[in-house]
Amino acid sequence: MSLFVMADLHLSSDRSKSMDIFGARWQDHMKKIEKNWNAVVSPEDTVIVPGDISWSLRLEDSLEDFRFLDSLNGQKLIGKGNHDFWWSTHSKLRTFWETNGIKSINILYNNAYRFDDCIVCGTRGWFVEEAQQHTIGEVEYAKIVNREAIRLRLSLEEAKKLQDQDKNLPLVVFLHFPPVWNEFVCREILDVLHEFDVKSCYFGHIHGAYHIPRTQQFEGIDFTICAADYLNFTPLPVWSI
């Protein structure tokens, strides 16, 4: 069994929110996802999807997008992104999937899972700079950042419980937002990563930055971009430290 990651699928099965307007790389991106995903992911593998999964505004409207995701090879662990307005409680999401026969999707949000070579955990995170919030409206930056730091700590505390069973397994964090981007640093999130000695963190959210290195190090932590367009819509193998 292998572990992969790819964020920012931005699914729109009814094409009400086409991604084609964002450039040639996004043309027919759902077809690319289906082809490339199934080419590298086997049925026994797991793919982590850290947010921005469906453009739907309501959970009931997201069914076809989840059916598409469910049809792809492997198990999926999904996190929350800033565009996932359909997101609901864990119980409501699981009931919705169970009712509609969706069996390969589970939640990675304030919790943790153990795999053969690492323990994975994650949450959404938040914008690295207050000025970026224009994409979702007026919110209280400091309040939400602190809340997201608490959620990350909850997830890492669950991961630590699993790590107690095998001290050699590293903790790998999956966020939607990058804790570090260019000269901006989300110190609240970064401090939690240091507190739990995290050395590997994956993030999405950033689009069109195809020139940057896939992995960059900051304060001893490897930060790896896993946005779907950066990966050319091919899930990336997760390499633990």
Indicate residue ranges for each PLM-predicted region:
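N-terminal, positively charged/glycine-rich alpha-helical extensions of SAM-dependent methyltransferases
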Residues: M1-A7
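Active-site metal-binding loops of divalent metal-dependent hydrolases
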Residues: A7-L11, G51-S54, N82-D84, N111, ...
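Conserved catalytic scaffold of divalent metal-dependent phosphoesterases
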Residues: L9-L11, S91-F184
